[in-house]
Amino acid sequence: MNIRITGHARGLGRSLYEHFKSLGHNVEGYSLSTGYDINTVEGRKQILDGLDQVDVFVNNAWSEYSGQTKLLEEVIQVWDGNKDKKILNISSKACYNYNDVNIDLAVSYTHLTLPTIYS
């Protein structure tokens, strides 16, 4: 399965990235620290490039502006109702201040989303 994750460099995004990699999936990560800014048109274009080859899009990158919402809208437009594609949209400021306790708890619940992703 081809999975693309924004905000993959730390926190929940990093844990999801590593988890899906460990399951043998092809996982691509996009983060501000690796040069992809969801708040810019160019950054979103880079993330959307080749999206037709992706099965699951994890919209996890945090944005002070409307970048995450704009990116979600653009992914929906590119996929144009393709029901074989899956979007996991993560939006919680609680994840911004993670620590060893709450990140482990969050990752332990990822199995709850897997049936949706793999359906």
PLM feature spans:
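Conserved hydrophobic beta-strands of the Rossmann-like cofactor-binding core
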Residues: 2-5, 57-58
